[in-house]
Amino acid sequence: ITLLALNKIGAIGVLINTSLTGDPLMHCINSSDSVKCIVGAERADALEDVLDQINITKQEDFLWAEDTAEFSLPDWAIDLKAQLDLSDDQNLEETNSVKAKDVACYIFTSGTTGVPKAAICPNQKLMAASINIKMAGYRIDETDCMHNSLPLYHSTGLMLGLCAVIQAGASTFIKRKFSASSFWDEVQQYNTTALVYIGELCRYLANTEPTQAEQNNPLKVMVGNGLRPDVWDIFKDRFGVDRIVEIYGASEGNALFMNLLNKDKTIGMTNAQVALIEYDVAEDKIIKNDDGTCKKITTHDPGLLIVFISPNSVFNGY
């Protein structure tokens, strides 16, 4: 709700991993040039630990959201709900000037090759991705409900999950943390017909003992990334999922592969201009021909995927 509200007035939402503490948390706040911070009560302690290291300093710029009654308002923040109660319910003038090219949010990379980087996500990318995923991937409508237990600060949970649901006019069951033991009970209770996944989540489910709740379940389609071939078979055969749409892409990437045709164990196709080139993993460098050009992969060997940047395949940067 917060992200949608910020987007409506043209403000940029900076989506920060809620498990971060210390220097990584400080880096994400400062590198994004954030001027205000909305923090859930359960994460206030982690934020308080870096208060003297971040660029946001005024009490009125820290908005504290009470999730449960067990937490109390810290003296360095103001109560978000109290501010909302004072707000006008009429649209602000700024809502009329928001454009498709404007930045919707910053989505941080995982930081596996260094510190997390804030990938720029314009409105048009958010809209195009969610529309394509809804229409060509899930093929859901207002009668469907999606199970989403992925973090909304990453592209999978946000774009493949929440935004696709909004585009479809469907409903969603959002869970703060995934639980393999209660998953099928939730699917049955909320009649979730769609699932947004990552491979690790599916592996946990595949390793569980069979339960009554998984029998005759309503789940018919799942979209996500990282599904291993052996787990793929389990979701088709044991769990009876008719359509599995594996995705391959990146938050900052300008190409998206999608298993549109429901072929087993494939990332599918893309309309972007791409090439697979030879890459030396040990030396961390591209292998080139004598004339300095890249060497294309001609067999089924692994390589480095590169994507041509064009007006139709834009790289928005960091």
Regions found by a protein language model. Name each.
Residues 64, 69, 85-108, 115, ...:
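Conserved pre-ATP/AMP-binding loop-to-beta segment of ANL
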Residues 88-91, 100, 119-141, 149, ...:
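Conserved structural elements of the adenylate-forming
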Residues 127-145, 153-194:
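Conserved AMP-binding/adenylation subdomain of ANL enzymes
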Residues 167, 189-198, 206-282, 294, ...:
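Gly/Ser/Thr-rich phosphate-binding loop
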Residues 281-318:
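Conserved ATP/PPi-binding loop(s) of AMP-dependent carboxylate-activating enzymes
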